[in-house]
Amino acid sequence: MKTVSQLIDMKQKETKISMVTAYDFPSAKQVEAAGIDMILVGDSLGMTVLGYESTVQVTLADMIHHGRAVRRGAPNTFVVVDMPIGAVGISMTQDLNHALKLYQETNANAIKAEGAHITPFIEKATAIGIPVVAHLGLTPQSVGVMGYKLQGATKEAAEQLILDAKNVEQAGAVALVLEAIPNDLAEEISKHLTIPVIGIGAGKGTDGQVLVYHDMLNYGVEHKAKFVKQFADFSVGVDGLKQYDQEVKSGAFPSEEYTYKKKIMNEVNNND
């Protein structure tokens, strides 16, 4: 399992960091088997595996449930679990209680929290021993206000993002996720920080990349963002399901190959 210091060492050696967002035991098991460096249990699970319309409906209980499953599937991978909407920003005491609960009950290596406004929370969480990954740029919990669009696209917005990135590092963040920002801006931020910067839709100038398991494997998704490359096609599973349906209806399944050979009814009938 990678440690924070090893991830920082990878950045210093210019070794790119791979990260995949996964939500359950089997996907986490596959991600670990593939040798991926980090797993993110993102609150995007609300739309991807729970069928919610947005991340707004995702609860702390949801994140704990899925975080535990991922940890069981990937016991030797650096796992980061999202703080869902409403878990940060109420009061510092409550925020830290939520963070501690999520961190302890999932056995994660770090938690992730969105936005530039959470630097005081990062400081306090770090002080009590909870590693925090920050998330700037497009933050899914704020799309109701920001919309799904490129962030940092003006001079003022870019300058603010650079400042925000420096602030979250100074507050104690162990890594930073940058989402949907210009490539050159992401590269500039990565150069100026000592912590690893993981990009999603932020070009190749970051220290690593993250994609969602279901997006990159075309597994049950209808719409994919511009920055998503499909590396395999799990949608072919539908063909297998159709064949199963046909074989059940025709009686072709189960054949003898898939049937236990022991006969018992003669013994039952002889006892009558």
From Swiss-Prot:
Cofactors needed by this protein, per the record, are: Mg(2+)
Q: Which CDD domains does the record match to this protein?
A: KPHMT-like (cd06557)
Its UniProt pathway annotation is: Cofactor biosynthesis; (R)-pantothenate biosynthesis; (R)-pantoate from 3-methyl-2-oxobutanoate: step 1/2
Which InterPro entries has this protein been placed in?
A: Pantoate_hydroxy_MeTrfase (IPR003700), Pyrv/PenolPyrv_kinase-like_dom (IPR015813), Pyrv_kinase-like_dom_sf (IPR040442)
| Annotated GO MF terms | 3-methyl-2-oxobutanoate hydroxymethyltransferase activity; magnesium ion binding
Q: What subcellular locations does the record give?
A: Cytoplasm
May I have one GO cellular component term?
cytoplasm
According to the record, cofactor stoichiometry and binding are noted as: Binds 1 Mg(2+) ion per subunit.
What does it catalyze?
3-methyl-2-oxobutanoate + (6R)-5,10-methylene-5,6,7,8-tetrahydrofolate + H2O = 2-dehydropantoate + (6S)-5,6,7,8-tetrahydrofolate
Show the active-site residues.
179
The EC number(s) this enzyme carries:
2.1.2.11
Amino acids binding 3-methyl-2-oxobutanoate = 43-44, 82, 112
Picking any one GO biological process from the record gives: pantothenate biosynthetic process
Alphabetic keyword roster? Cytoplasm, Magnesium, Metal-binding, Pantothenate biosynthesis, Transferase
Q: Provide the family line.
A: Belongs to the PanB family.
What role does it play?
Catalyzes the reversible reaction in which hydroxymethyl group from 5,10-methylenetetrahydrofolate is transferred onto alpha-ketoisovalerate to form ketopantoate.
Protein name per its UniProtKB record: 3-methyl-2-oxobutanoate hydroxymethyltransferase
The species is Staphylococcus aureus (strain COL)
Gene this protein is translated from? panB
